[in-house]
Curated annotation (Swiss-Prot):
Binding site for ATP: 17-25, 40
UniProt keyword list: ATP-binding, Kinase, Nucleotide-binding, Serine/threonine-protein kinase, Transferase
Protein's recorded name: Serine/threonine-protein kinase csk1
GO molecular function: ATP binding; cyclin binding; cyclin-dependent protein kinase activating kinase activity; cyclin-dependent protein serine/threonine kinase activity; protein kinase activity; protein serine kinase activity; protein serine/threonine kinase activity
Gene Ontology cellular component terms for the protein in this record: cyclin-dependent protein kinase holoenzyme complex; cytoplasm; cytosol; nucleus
Family: Belongs to the protein kinase superfamily. CMGC Ser/Thr protein kinase family. CDC2/CDKX subfamily.
Origin organism lineage: Eukaryota, Fungi, Dikarya, Ascomycota, Taphrinomycotina
InterPro entries recorded: CDK, Kinase-like_dom_sf, Prot_kinase_dom
Reactions this protein catalyses: L-seryl-[protein] + ATP = O-phospho-L-seryl-[protein] + ADP + H(+); L-threonyl-[protein] + ATP = O-phospho-L-threonyl-[protein] + ADP + H(+)
Catalytic residue positions: 129 (proton acceptor)
Ranges where the Protein kinase domain occurs: 11-306
EC assignment: 2.7.11.22
Kinase keyword on record: yes
Name of the gene: csk1
A GO BP annotation: regulation of meiotic cell cycle
Length: 306
């Protein structure tokens, strides 16, 4: 098996950084400079749906947006059955610094990722795994970049998901409610839902829903229960698509009323509650454009308390 350096001879001092679900991640320094690059090595042979390294590569190569991680170079090792994705090294991961960055930076991150999602929607691309680990920062002041398209999907590059989409997408308590009910025909609404959760947690510094991960026992049923106890028990009258989800009728849920957002996010400004309430909702989730149009007023309001 050829070494990582064989495929990226313009990098030196290549060292292992971390491991992902289907990848090994290395970091190296460009020769004759101090600039760092990340090398993500993903297998092509042993797929773990919805992970698809080649599809992710093709989607990323088709994207050109200032707040979406850009591929600098890529290589395929046919002998080992691996794909190499080279990107610029970013100093911070949002999940590591959420409680340290300023209100102003948080507002900028929301607007920058909203712009990225607006771009993805325009081009028919679903990210399907938005959470703080997949938001990278150049510095503690940003800018922010949406990263990791390993389970992304697009109409142009559907991979094996041609007839129907896989519902097992997302990470932990960020999973969209329709995927928990086995929906195979979801759209951009899944990214809007997860983005809403990210915004809520960015400004509250606490998890919006509970899937049991904090106790070491993550559960789809526990996450579903947490969502329903928070947003109220859905029904086909308020959410017509619900009756089409394969797993909706497999359970009988207690009838919970929806909690007011002032109770769900008591420590968060009402302007943030308003934005989140239009994203983390069963039906008619707001578009990224709504967030972009609304957030300048939010930023101005929050700056008074900064």
């Amino acid at each position: 098996m050829k070494s990582v350096g064989h495929f990226v001879p313009w990098l030196t001092d290549i060292r292992h950084l971390t491991d992902g679900t289907i990848s090994e991640v290395f970091v190296g320094e460009r020769k004759n400079s101090k600039k760092l690059y990340v090398i993500k090595v993903q297998g092509l042979v042993f797929k773990r749906p919805p992970h698809d390294a080649m599809r992710g590569k093709l989607i990323l190569e088709s994207i050109g947006h200032p707040h979406i991680e850009r591929i600098v170079d890529s290589f395929i090792d046919n002998e080992a059955g691996s794909v190499y994705l080279i990107t610029s090294f970013k100093s911070f991961v949002l999940s590591d610094v959420m409680d340290e960055i300023s209100i102003d930076t948080k507002c900028k991150i929301v607007l920058q990722i909203s712009s990225a999602l607006e771009y993805l929607e325009k081009h028919g691309i679903l990210h399907r795994d938005i959470h703080p680990n997949n938001i990278l920062l150049d510095s503690m002041n940003g800018p922010a970049y949406l990263s990791d398209f390993s389970i992304a999907w697009s109409k142009q590059h559907p991979g094996e998901e041609v007839q129907e989409l896989i519902p097992q997408i997302g990470t932990g308590h960020y999973r969209a409610i329709e995927t928990l009910f086995g929906c195979h025909s979801y759209g951009h609404e899944v990214d809007r839902w997860t983005f809403g959760i990210l915004i809520a947690e960015l400004f509250s510094n606490q998890a919006l829903f509970d899937d049991g991960s904090s106790e070491g026992w993550p559960s789809e049923l526990r996450l579903t229960s947490s969502i329903i106890q928070t947003l109220g028990t859905p029904n086909p009258s308020m959410w017509p698509e619900l009756s089409t989800f394969p797993d909706w009728n497999k359970f009988i849920f207690h009838e919970y009323p929806p909690k007011p957002w002032s109770e769900i996010l008591p420590s968060v400004d009402t302007s943030i509650q308003y934005i989140v309430s239009h994203l983390v909702t069963y039906s008619n989730r707001a578009s990224p454009s709504f967030v972009i149009e609304s957030f300048p007023k939010v930023s101005a309001r929050l700056s008074q308390y900064a």
